[in-house]
């Protein structure tokens, strides 16, 4: 059916195989050969992609190649981003003069994406990102919202709600299907930039259109690599667990929490550690002298942070006890002189 279809790149024969007990590597290889032979009876045009054992990571028993138009396809998740992590695949490719394809990777932070996918491209390895759209997640370029009607179905399925009528269930499913349309999804521009913007690792770019005078939400720090737009002590999952505590709005290590109590600022930054900082490029500037107010909340005193504008220290702030994590107070940095032109505001935890 697909033999003459040029829109089809090839056939990935088995996705993320894991050999059951009792199945040998020889049998595994022979299965791949048998499938390839069956394809070649009707199609000599398309690539066959061969994934290794253990979720596409182990190619033991699968060399040498058995077809002139095949590629070894590996997956990469939750590990370090160094060349050493893919060197065995590169060596296999060089030894047998066969192309590599990284068929699946994702489910991590923007910095991890940037480092991994640049590593692949530097070594001439094509790649595929998993995945372009998920449901209420920060780790994909687009995120679909669960509608209230569909949530009612979820509650019923999980045993936490009464059974809806069939008409309601059908309407709920349709509402969620509409929510999945790309035009109805939430965009995650930082994710897309980490994958496609060649400047991501070189230039800090504004997340949104900040102005002076104006309000700058803490969660709307710049888009860019770790060390350019922000720093965070835990900024990707290298196999030892999560990289985020808030799991809202942005996909960096910066820990952001949804703030349902404030429509003006729906997200807040928390779980901060010493040395972490956030940077904000401000392009719409009216020069003058301003008071800088920073809204904070803390259940105890003792925290310290400082603010810089274009590299000049503005003040060191001792964080007071405001009464709780959600009891907000403004701290004031008065008489800040702002010149014309683009500004860079930096807030750093001490």
Predicted regions and their residues:
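Intrinsic disorder/low-complexity segments enriched in polar/charged and small flexible residues
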Residues: 56, 68, 103, 114, ...
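Sequence-level detector for tyrosine residue identity
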Residues: 1-2, 11, 32, 49, ...
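Alpha-helical protein-protein interaction elements
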Residues: 3, 63-64, 69-70, 81, ...
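Extracytoplasmic
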Residues: 194-350
